[in-house]
Each structure stands twice: as C-alpha cells, then as structure tokens.
Amino acid sequence: MKILVTGGAGFIGSNFVYYELDNYPNDEVICLDKLTYAGNLETLEVAMKNPKFKFVKGDIADRAFVDELFASEKPDVVVNFAAESHVDRSIENPEIFLQTNIIGTSVLMDACRKYGNIRYHQVSTDEVYGDLPLDRPDLFFTETTPLHTSSPYSASKASADLLVQAYYRTYKLPVTISRCSNNYGPYHFPEKLIPLMIANALNDKKLPVYGKGENVRDWLYVEDHCSAIDLIIRKGKIGEVYNIGGHNERTNLEVVKTIIKELDKSEDLIEFVTDRPGHDRRYAIDPTKIHNELGWLPATKFDDGIKKTIDWYLTHKSWWEKIISGEYKDYYDKMYKNR
C-alpha cells in the first residue's frame, strides 16, 4: 500500500510516518509538507534513509501542485494531518487557518475523486465540540455531540469535517474522520503546553499558565493516537467519525506541576498570565465507539507518557533548542511576555 501523509513533518504526522514505516515495512509512505514554522525536516532524518519513504515539499491548498503529485504518485490512501493548529495564532490571524484547514482539505479530496476515488482520512480534533463545564465530570464528547466551536482554529477544523462528510454523501468518496484529544510525546513543537513547560523548566525560565490553570484536557500519547488512526484507515467503517481519547484528564496546572516534579524544579517557576479569549474549560472524549468497533484502547498512562516525553526532550536538546532560538522566540515574547 502507498500512503500519502500530509503534514508529515509536523508533530503527529511525523510520528505517524514512523509508525507506518516501523509496522508495515513493505508499504510506501510519501510525506507532503509545506514546512511552515511547525514543520521540521530534522524530524524526518531517520525516515529519509528508508527507501520506502519519500518527502515532497508543497502546499495542500495548491491545486495544480496537488493534482500533479497525485498523477505521478497514485497513492492508495491519503491521511491528512496538514493543518494550522495553534489556537492563539488563529486568534491573531484567522485567514491562514481558513486557507489550509478548509481549502486544503477540499483540494485533497478533489484529487482523491479525480484519481480513482482514493481512500481519504481526515485527522480532526475534539475542539470542534466546544467545551464542557468543569462542574460536570460525568459529561463527555461522543461522535454525536453537536459541533460548537470556540475559536477560528476549531471553526476551521469543524468546517473541514463537514466538508468531508459532504463529499461522502454527495460523491461517495470513501472517507473517515477521527477527532482526538490533546496529544503529547516526541517531536512536539514547543509552543504547546507540555513541550513549552519542559523546555522552559530545563532552562529555569518562567512557566506561563493561563488564568488559574483550572482548564482540563484529556491527554493522549501520540503513539497511541497513531495506532488508532492506523486501525481506522485499515478497518474503519467508511463515512464514520471516530473519537480518540486518552482517559487521562488533568488540569493544566496539574500537568505543569507533574513536569516540575519529574524535573526536580521549583513551583516558583509557575507564572499565571492573563487568560486568552474564549479559553475552553474542559475537553473530555468518550472513545467507546472505536473500542467497541475496532478494539482500540490507549496503551499509555499519563504518568508513564510524561516520563517518556521528558526523557525524549532531555536526549534531543539540539532539536528543540534550535527551534526556540529562532522565529518562535519572537512569537513567544509577543504571546506571553506582557500578559
């Protein structure tokens, strides 16, 4: 099988590339990535040595380019990780989110239709459901929860999901959608909570926490997410949505304190900053459907996953130090320095 992985130089996409190459040595993996700030070719350094892997630089919203790629490579499956994904950035500049997350999705699906009704999987997010109240721990997102977005980012992803479902109903394109909870693990770009806190703590820098740190997220180790997506593209029911959750709910403050404890740092590093607009209170996914239909369950407990993640950052300092010393530093200062 030949799999086209878009956004494969990013965090989850690169982990999925390695998952496929490791578990299916006879399959071919093509990585298409625009190499924006969150894409990093160094992440794919090991994959580049594999004869079954090919990297292509390009934009999923470039219709002519995508058309040419499909004509030459003829993939059997497309897994779309390519997305602008940071909520704060979407508040600063929504336009690029609409272009990549919505237009890019339509361009990919049009190519799938044109070149043989190719199997298409959309990687989405639990943020399309909005949020849940902190005082109702009995509530969870299911696949039938109405879409109720809170940011330009989540609105763009929800729009893409609706477009995918429309292509299934209108054109009979063989599609599936997965909606995951917050991921963590190797190769995570250090603008997101866990890698940001690890990098800052290692450098004895302040750990900026929005509001009082009471917002709750369900954490999913990235390898578990990859195994779920692999199951869906190989055994999932066409036209269906699958929620992928980690059964690991934590407040943001609990996550930060766990990292501090593992690194033997002081809680004095914690600095509470002004909350962002429309900050969702709680995300919690019910993954019953994917468990019942495909037999999937998350294998990694949060405490184990966070230790593995910290160990990875300790042994790959050159990878993330290059990132935080570049363009990201200006963005970081803008977002946190004066809040």
Identify the function of each model-found stretch:
Residues 137, 149-156, 186, 190-194, ...:
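The catalytic Tyr-centered alpha-helix of NAD(P)H-dependent dehydrogenases
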Residues 65, 96, 103, 189-193, ...:
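Residue-level recognition of oxygen-bearing side chains
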Residues 159, 163, 167, 197, ...:
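Hydrophobic alpha-helix immediately C-terminal to the catalytic Tyr-X-X-X-Lys motif of short-chain
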Residues 16, 22, 29, 35, ...:
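C-terminal substrate-binding subdomain of Rossmann-fold SDR/epimerase-dehydratase oxidoreductases
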Residues 41-44, 132-135, 188-191, 255-256, ...:
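Short aromatic-enriched loop/helix-cap "lid" or pocket-rim segments at secondary-structure transitions
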Residues 1-183, 308, 313-318, 322-339:
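N-terminal Rossmann-like NAD(P)+-binding domain of SDR-like oxidoreductases, especially those catalyzing
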Residues 12, 38-39, 64, 188, ...:
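Residues that form or flank phosphate/diphosphate-binding pockets in enzymes
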